[in-house]
């Protein structure tokens, strides 16, 4: 499996194609450098550099790419395990349609969820600068001779799923990209952006807020939320420390969907999330709880990926309840 990361390796940060890459799990500081790698056995991966990774993505038989931004307190092995399940479900639903590409940002390895939460929140914000460089590198590659833009350009569609605090990484990435690299707003880069159990304030996608850039960069933005998500309930309580009392987007959906751009949609998962992930009801976008069968949230996402529309039969519909 290919992946991109801004976690420090135990080796030097100097990139070199073909070298061994081993995560330094005791260092959760985001690196300014970004590493383009391929997974290996026993935690020993291989750095292949950006040109080789983009070449492999371009030459893949899959028609679409699905970037995966994981949540807080997820170490690389867990991220790869979930990404592999995501790839398996995509292949079962429609072979050669989707290639899953995880983006691994640094989560803490300390004991104690509260301490981890604050360390990871800082890492999420700082990771935005690193992954903004990834987007800029992709734009450079897309227009370079390596992509043969005038002969056989890469036409794969790009989708993104961000879970929990991964949505904070997404928001900060687009903000940093817009501030430092772009002249007049972000380009329409993503076909679908799926924000699952998003650990950001529920006004994030409102017009005028920082997260509005997510809707500018996406054809569709789909928010999956559940009011009984225990992990986000704890998150809201933890954020009171910083005097942030607003509810989380993954708890309620947008505070007022009429104040969000028209390409933002919301999906109420309250009836299924705890049966898929007991007892917290937070990790509900993969299986139906048995680890083997696709759940309704995954099926809904995959239908959006294939069709490119959230509600193809009713262009005015913006909400649905999964049961």
Model-inferred region functions:
Residues 1-46, 59, 80, 95-156, ...:
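Lipolytic serine-hydrolase domain surface
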Residues 70, 163, 282:
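Histidine-centered divalent metal-coordination motifs
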Residues 159, 163-164, 194:
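Residue in the alpha/beta-hydrolase core beta-strand immediately N-terminal to the catalytic nucleophile
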Residues 52-106:
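Short, surface-exposed "cap/lid" segments of acyl-processing enzymes
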Residues 69-76, 117-121, 160:
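Short, charged/polar micro-motifs that form catalytic or ligand-binding hotspots
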Residues 131, 162, 166, 170:
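Gly/Ala-rich beta-loop-alpha elbow adjacent to hydrolase catalytic centers
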Residues 74, 167, 200:
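Active-site micro-motifs of SAM-dependent methyltransferase domains
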């Amino acid at each position: 499996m290919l992946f991109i990361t801004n976690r420090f390796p135990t080796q030097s940060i100097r990139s070199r194609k073909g070298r061994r890459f081993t995560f330094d799990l005791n260092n959760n500081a985001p690196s300014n450098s970004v590493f383009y790698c391929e997974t290996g056995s026993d935690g020993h991966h291989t750095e292949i550099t950006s040109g080789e990774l983009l070449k492999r993505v371009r030459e893949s038989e899959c028609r679409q790419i699905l970037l995966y931004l994981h949540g807080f307190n997820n170490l690389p092995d867990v991220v790869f395990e979930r990404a592999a399940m995501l790839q398996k479900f995509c292949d079962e639903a429609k072979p050669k349609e989707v290639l899953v590409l995880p983006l691994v940002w640094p989560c803490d390895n300390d004991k104690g969820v509260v301490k981890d939460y604050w360390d990871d929140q800082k890492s999420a914000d700082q990771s935005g600068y690193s992954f903004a460089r990834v987007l800029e590198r992709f734009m450079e590659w897309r227009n370079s001779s390596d992509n043969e833009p005038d002969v056989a350009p890469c036409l794969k569609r790009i989708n993104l799923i961000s879970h929990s605090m991964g949505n904070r990484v997404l928001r900060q990435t687009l903000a940093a990209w817009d501030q430092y690299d772009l002249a007049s707003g972000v380009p329409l880069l993503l076909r679908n952006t799926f924000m699952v159990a998003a650990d950001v304030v529920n006004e994030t996608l409102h017009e005028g807020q920082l997260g509005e850039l997510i809707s500018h960069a996406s054809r569709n933005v789909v928010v999956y939320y559940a009011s009984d998500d225990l992990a986000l309930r704890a998150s809201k309580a933890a954020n009171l420390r910083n005097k942030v009392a607003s509810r989380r987007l993954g708890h309620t959906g947008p505070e007022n969907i009429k104040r969000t751009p028209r390409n933002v949609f919301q999906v109420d998962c309250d009836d299924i999330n705890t049966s898929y992930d007991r007892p917290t009801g937070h990790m509900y976008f993969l299986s139906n709880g048995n680890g083997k069968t696709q759940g309704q949230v995954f099926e809904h996402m995959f239908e959006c990926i294939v069709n490119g529309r959230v509600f193809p039969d009713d262009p005015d519909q913006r909400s649905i309840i999964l049961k």
